[in-house]
Amino acid sequence: MVDNSKIRVVVGMSGGVDSSVSALLLKQQGFDVVGVFMKNWDDTDDSGVCTATEDYEDVKKVADEIGIPYYSINFEKDYWERVFEYFLDEYKKGRTPNPDVMCNKEIKFKSFLDFAMDLDADYIAMGHYAATRVDDNGVVHMMRPKDGNKDQTYFLSQLSQDQLKKVIFPLANLTKPQVREIAIASGLATAKKKDSTGICFIGERNFKKFLSEFLPAQSGKMVTPDGKVVGEHAGLMYYTIGQRSGLGLGSTKESTDPWFVVGKDLKKNELIVEQGYDSKLLYATSLDASGVSFFTGQPDHDVDLKCTAKFRYRQPDVGVTMHYRAKDNTVHVEFDEPARAVTPGQAIVFYNGEECLGGATIDRAYQNEKQLQLV
């Protein structure tokens, strides 16, 4: 029988209820648990309160309640260089990036993992809702967790096999309400703390205002697909494909339907808009994606596979045929049914039943082999 007390697990503790309960459960299972608070961003909010200071206080309280040692580590430099600069660069290209995917790949499961190994960790853990399965050959597979509503495999889709082998997901078989119940029953300081929302480093702040601090906004024309000027946009980076709110456009003589962003023309600095949720320009039949990462490793040959996919968080799976090209590590994905608002810069993540296979970054979308002007 394995003696868990000889297995050290370093837990990334955010000051939230999920990572608090992860640390508690591991401690109850007899592991040698160490808590670490990551400071990735100088996050003074709009009211002048540094939320990281409050969060670290909560980590200290919970660590004391559980009876584990704790540390704080600053990854602001790593975060800026590996996540935030990528985030800004994608927006400059007119794309809509997913910084949470990159944060997991580069910070939580790279910088933090390296730090944990320096603390003689055998494994790391956090508060993610995900699960793993080890096959007979010792290969670790990423699986969906019990709580499908909180499933975070989408955000973990760029992790490697080496990273996955070093991770424990204590919340794999729990629902969020059960996690809250455990925290309350155990009297943890974070038991009733509300979940954080928004992009990991922006938090609750106004996104438009935040982005304008780092990228100069360039206003331009809002045009219909046939070139008619209908308004002015504040800067292409503020809009995403399929967006309805914030356009400031009213009904026309022809239609009372709301307006939606259906494309961008980066060269002309024009935002392409059209009335109607079901605008044909919002529907893609296929896409190209690059930077493919499979949890079980990259195949050395081309692969064609029928599976399902998500191209945004929390959307229901859609049926696809994936064509992997080993030469340049890309995929061409064909949708079983036309897919609405496929967005360059976002992650597409592949599933085979309960298993998450991995993901890639969307580059282009097509409608019947004609490229949609999404960037």
Curated annotation (Swiss-Prot):
UniProt entry tagged with the keyword Coiled coil: no
Gene: mnmA
Family named by the database record: Belongs to the MnmA/TRMU family.
Region (Interaction with tRNA): 150-152, 312-313
Entry binding sites for ATP: 12-19, 38, 127
Disulfide topology: 103-200
GO MF annotation terms: ATP binding; tRNA binding; tRNA-uridine 2-sulfurtransferase activity
Keywords per UniProt: ATP-binding, Cytoplasm, Disulfide bond, Nucleotide-binding, RNA-binding, Transferase, tRNA processing, tRNA-binding
Function as written in the Swiss-Prot or TrEMBL entry: Catalyzes the 2-thiolation of uridine at the wobble position (U34) of tRNA, leading to the formation of s(2)U34.
Record protein name field: tRNA-specific 2-thiouridylase MnmA
PANTHER family named among the record's database cross-references: MITOCHONDRIAL TRNA-SPECIFIC 2-THIOURIDYLASE 1, TRNA 5-METHYLAMINOMETHYL-2-THIOURIDYLATE -METHYLTRANSFERASE
Domain of life: Bacteria
GO biological process annotation, one example: tRNA wobble position uridine thiolation
Active site: 103, 200
Residues the record marks as site: Interaction with tRNA: 128, 346
Entry EC no(s): 2.8.1.13
Places the protein is found: Cytoplasm
Entry-linked InterPro entries: MnmA-like, MnmA-like_C, MnmA-like_central, MnmA-like_central_sf, Rossmann-like_a/b/a_fold
